[in-house]
């Protein structure tokens, strides 16, 4: 019978590596510490009833390599051996996975722990710097990812290792500051009467913000898809869309600056995910860094902290692979999150 295990021993190779999102799941297999990961086509979560079926048909049926262990990054709380995912119907059951897929050892981590692991060693070709600050590259870092929601993860450097710190930073309060904010915020969709950062800084939040602008300006909204809003904004073809993305960048800068102070992230703040990559031209305009640095009495500190957009297409898998190769370099907690045959 598989059972929870708190061992910090390295996962045995070959290792199945998975990044499980709400819409897509991405998988690779790492055969040893020196090999490049073998990548598999993305799996649509809606196409399979369970994650076990997706792994079997999307990975194991397509290779002769049988993984001995697995490390999976999931969006959702990891409290026991039945782990429901936040944005899809799958439930991760490590014990069932061990019994049914021939895997000996399963470790499950938070999706933004994986993103944090990735930013420990991103090369310049996999990140785009915003602003002039360079920071301290062996200091703590933080990663924010506006996507389906707003993920936040810290990466603390201590005792010669990188320690990922998961959390729910995307649900901090986000309040109005400017005159325009006070016009718009009464029209932002709330959760139990509060506006959290995630109510604006994600895909649906972009639509919330666009709709609020349309209401205040007395115009008919014509777009319901975040991709349409960003496309029109970057093309300059719709005034409301342009303001939406500009304010999105401002609010993201405010929250990113807050997180930089929380983690004392002298090593940098990293923006991950498809939205950050798509609106990179807007983030490079002054509004983002101005909002990021506007943190009196600590403006001087924020000016020294670099900000980046992660451009690596598979950052979470890269982070998990780094951990799988050299676990001694990372302080990843396995308590209550690792199961062995």
From Swiss-Prot:
Gene3D superfamilies, alphabetized: 3.30.420.40, 3.40.367.20
UniProt superkingdom: Bacteria
Cellular component aspect of the GO annotation: cytosol
Assigned keywords, A-Z: ATP-binding, Cytoplasm, Glycolysis, Kinase, Nucleotide-binding, Transferase
Substrates-to-products reaction catalysed: D-glucose + ATP = D-glucose 6-phosphate + ADP + H(+)
Enzyme class, UniProt record, top EC level: transferase
Pfam families documented for this protein: Glucokinase
GO BP annotation list: glycolytic process
Record localization: Cytoplasm
InterPro entries recorded: ATPase_NBD (IPR043129), Bacterial_glucokinase (IPR050201), Glucokinase (IPR003836)
Annotated residues for binding of ATP: 18-23
Gene Ontology MF annotations: ATP binding; D-glucose binding; glucokinase activity
Keyword Transferase: yes
EC number: 2.7.1.2
Family: Belongs to the bacterial glucokinase family.
Name of the protein described by the UniProt record: Glucokinase
Organism taxonomic ancestry: Bacteria, Pseudomonadati, Pseudomonadota, Alphaproteobacteria, Hyphomicrobiales
């Amino acid at each position: 019978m598989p059972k929870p295990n708190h061992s910090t021993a390295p996962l045995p190779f070959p290792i199945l590596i998975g990044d499980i999102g709400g819409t897509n799941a991405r998988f690779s297999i790492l055969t040893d510490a020196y090999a490049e990961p073998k990548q598999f086509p993305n799996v649509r979560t809606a196409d399979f009833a369970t994650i076990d079926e997706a792994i079997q048909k999307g990975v194991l049926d397509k290779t002769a390599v049988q993984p001995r262990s697995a490390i999976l990054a999931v969006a959702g709380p990891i409290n026991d051996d039945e782990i429901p995912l936040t944005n899809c119907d799958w439930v991760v059951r490590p014990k069932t996975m061990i019994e049914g897929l021939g895997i000996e050892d399963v470790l499950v981590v938070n999706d933004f722990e994986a993103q944090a692991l990735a930013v420990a060693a991103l090369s310049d070709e996999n990140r785009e710097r915003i602003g002039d600050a360079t920071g301290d590259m062996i200091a703590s870092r933080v990663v924010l990812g506006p996507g389906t929601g707003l993920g936040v993860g810290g990466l603390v450097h201590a005792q010669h290792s990188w320690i990922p710190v998961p959390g729910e930073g995307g649900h901090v309060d986000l309040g109005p500051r400017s005159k325009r904010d006070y016009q718009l915020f009464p029209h932002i969709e709330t959760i139990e009467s509060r506006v959290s950062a995630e109510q604006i800084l994600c895909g649906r939040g972009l639509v919330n913000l666009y709709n609020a602008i349309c209401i205040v300006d007395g115009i008919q909204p014509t777009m319901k898809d975040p991709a349409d809003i960003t496309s029109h904004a970057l093309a300059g073809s719709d005034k409301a869309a342009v303001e939406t993305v500009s304010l999105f960048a401002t609010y993201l800068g405010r929250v990113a600056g807050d997180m930089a102070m929380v983690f004392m992230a002298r090593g940098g703040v990293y923006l991950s995910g498809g939205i950050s990559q798509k609106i990179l031209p807007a983030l490079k305009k002054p509004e983002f860094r101005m909002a990021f640095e506007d943190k009196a009495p600590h403006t001087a500190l924020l000016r020294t902290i670099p900000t980046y957009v992660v451009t690596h297409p598979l950052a979470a898998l890269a982070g998990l692979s780094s951990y799988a190769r050299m676990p001694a370099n990372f302080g990843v907690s396995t308590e209550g999150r690792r199961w062995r045959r």
